[in-house]
From Swiss-Prot:
The organism's place on the tree of life at top rank: Eukaryota
Source species: Dictyostelium discoideum (Social amoeba)
Protein name per its UniProtKB record: Uncharacterized protein DDB_G0283871
Induction remarks: Down-regulated by phagocytic stimuli.
Gene3D superfamilies in UniProt: nmb1532 protein domain like
């Protein structure tokens, strides 16, 4: 039997100037990559970070409630990545390494330290958010301490965004070629089902789902992939009700007005 040609990912630039992999070909119906949730999660995470960065570049709150919305948005994105990284390490990686031991060394020596570094920098963000939450004297853009606080928030957020893009970029280049060449569809589906069930029970599930559907608005390949995977009735009836409370607020906050 002729050996499979090693799949090579193409590097493109995000709107924010970060390196990312061109993944659209893997979402096609004839693709041998069946762990679609892996791609969905990465696209959604990059999307919310990008949106939040764009919003904060020109964010000038006129009230304390707007500052509270910012804090809520940062916290939601933080929790998204915390849960995502945990599921990757504790479920996805362990399963994949069982299938192909060659994945162990690069995942644990390249991507794992990136996760650790993100956590360390994110702890700085948590401390800053905690300080902003407790300091009710900061009521709007003219309050003492606001300029310094938002400057630090934007600085840390940019670092975290770069780390997420880099870890996803490296992880995809480690995992995807091996999956395509060595892991059969049945095993990929098994992991996909396990990850889907785990994600459904995660506290961030509805926010993540909202982010995925948000990306679908501008990503035709993802939109078609999601439509094939999720029944029409669920997408059109159940999802809107769930997202109204759990994601739409974020979309409204990051909208540039």
């Amino acid at each position: 039997m002729e050996a499979k040609t090693q799949f090579e990912l193409i590097t493109i630039k995000s709107e924010d100037g970060f390196d990312e992999n061109e993944l659209s070909v893997l979402l096609k119906s004839d693709s041998d990559f069946h762990m679609n949730g892996f791609i969905w999660g990465h696209l959604a995470a990059k999307h919310v970070y990008s949106k939040l960065n764009s919003k904060l570049k020109s964010f000038e709150p006129k009230s304390r409630s707007e500052i509270n919305e910012m804090i809520k948005a940062i916290t939601a994105v933080t929790e998204f990545i915390e849960v995502h990284y945990y599921h990757e390490e504790e479920i996805a990686w362990k399963f994949l390494i069982e299938q192909q031991q060659c994945l162990s060394e690069p995942l644990l020596t390249i991507v794992k330290p990136q996760h650790t570094q993100w956590t360390e920098i994110n702890n700085e963000m948590k401390d800053l958010v905690k300080s902003l939450t407790e300091n009710q004297e900061i009521k709007d853009k003219s309050s003492n301490g606001w300029t310094e606080s938002i400057s630090k928030v934007k600085e840390i957020l940019q670092k975290l965004t770069a780390m997420v893009y880099k870890s996803f970029y490296d992880e995809e280049r480690i995992i995807i070629p091996v999956v395509l060449s060595s892991i059969p569809k049945s095993k990929q589906n098994k992991l996909g089902e396990k990850m889907n069930e785990t994600m459904k029970n995660a506290p961030t599930s509805k926010f993540v789902l909202g982010a995925i559907l948000d990306v679908c608005k501008t990503n035709k390949d993802l939109d078609e992939n999601v439509k094939k995977a999720i029944p029409w009735a669920v997408r059109k009836v159940i999802f809107p009700l769930a997202l109204e409370k759990n994601y739409n607020w974020f979309s409204e906050f990051v909208e540039i007005k």
